[in-house]
Design a protein with these regions (language model features):
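Intrinsically disordered, low-complexity linker/tail regions enriched in polar/charged residues
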Residues: 1-350
Length: 350
């Protein structure tokens, strides 16, 4: 693969593996194949019946801060799909064209190439088709059939779990004591999270939830592993959230969202390095692809970061030698001029 050697504005350009969190997982949690990836999730994808007298397993987990060696989190899997599908990138021609239907198609194509825990991801991944009134009943019936067929126990009582991915619509307490989680385009099918797991969600993802609470244009994308409790009652066993802009570009904070929106408004071409399992402070806020043959890092700093994160970010910026740094609250520095690449760009070595 020579994509990283191409002119940054070339259609064949690909970021270096080490420019995102994928680099730290290749060979340890993710194995690259010719046309996709194999990986092991840190969560089981099968439910095994308990023997008589066996203790009830611990409550579901939101996400593991540090996955076991050789395994990856749901967040890392979601970032992998986003990067494979090219949703971490932006060019002005995408304006107004990147909707849930396009996103779902690209993610579905990537799911066919990946194998979590040796199973084809496409066989257990549920993403709702875009809502259309005339087709809503048929789509809902198809989802119900898919969930039932995937989670039906076999002769030994072992049943598969399903990975559900979609934009969060609402999360509300219900009389059972659970929290009912609804996803857009499939609100007829609730997924239940017990209060303990949802309190953990609120703790782990508090910055993302707060960012969404004050900016309705941002999106929260849920990736969850669900299992059948009874007929049509599906419980969340593990859950991860990522925050994205209205154009589905992942961001780690409101500060990054401001940078991404400024770039989109300026008509720039760029990509957003995704953290996977790494600390997001290790990566630039965005990387321009239209300012010359080389990548151009854009850094954004917020005064509201904790001291540890701030020190890591500043050390990473120094290591990269970045020249463009925007401190929020101050005027954004001028962006480097846009440079149109040659019609037949040559590989750039070094």
């Amino acid at each position: 693969d020579t994509g990283a050697d191409h002119h940054a504005g070339c259609v064949h350009f690909e970021p270096l593996v080490g420019e995102s969190g994928l680099g730290s997982l290749l060979g340890s949690g993710i194995t690259a194949r010719e046309s996709g990836y194999d990986f092991r999730l840190a969560h089981a994808l099968r439910s095994v019946p308990r023997r008589a007298g066996e203790a009830t397993p611990a409550t579901a987990t939101v996400r593991e801060p540090r996955s076991a060696p050789g395994k990856i989190s749901l967040r890392a899997m979601t970032h992998l799909l986003w990067q494979q599908a090219g949703i971490d990138r932006w060019v002005p021609a995408m304006q107004g064209k990147r909707n849930w239907g396009v996103l779902r198609y690209r993610l579905s194509e990537c799911a066919r190439l990946n194998h979590p825990n040796t199973a084809p991801l496409a066989d257990i991944l549920l993403m709702a088709k875009p809502f259309k009134e005339s087709e809503a009943a048929g789509h809902a019936a198809a989802r119900a059939t898919f969930l039932a067929s995937c989670t039906q126990p076999d002769r030994d009582g072992v049943s598969r779990k399903v990975i559900v991915l979609g934009e969060l619509k609402s999360a509300t307490p219900v009389d059972s004591g659970d929290v009912r989680v609804l996803l857009k385009h499939m609100s007829e099918q609730p997924f239940l999270a017990d209060q303990k797991i949802w309190k953990r969600v609120q703790k782990v993802y508090r910055p993302l939830l707060k960012a969404k609470a004050v900016d309705d244009m941002l999106r929260l994308v849920v990736t969850a592993i669900v299992s059948a409790q009874t007929e049509r009652v599906y419980r969340i066993d593990a859950l991860s959230l990522i925050l994205t802009t209205e154009n589905w570009i992942p961001v780690e904070s409101a500060a990054e969202a401001e940078l991404i929106r400024a770039l989109v408004a300026a008509g720039r071409s760029f990509y957003k390095p995704l953290a996977f399992a790494s600390n997001p402070a290790m990566f630039p806020g965005a990387v321009l692809r239209d300012s010359g043959p080389k990548r151009f890092n854009l850094e954004v700093i917020s005064a509201f970061e904790d001291e540890k994160t701030g020190k890591l970010r500043m050390a990473s910026i120094k290591d990269r030698g970045s020249k463009w740094i925007w401190t929020l609250g101050e005027a954004m520095p001028p962006l480097p001029p846009r440079i149109v690449p040659p019609r037949s760009p040559q590989p750039v070595v070094g």
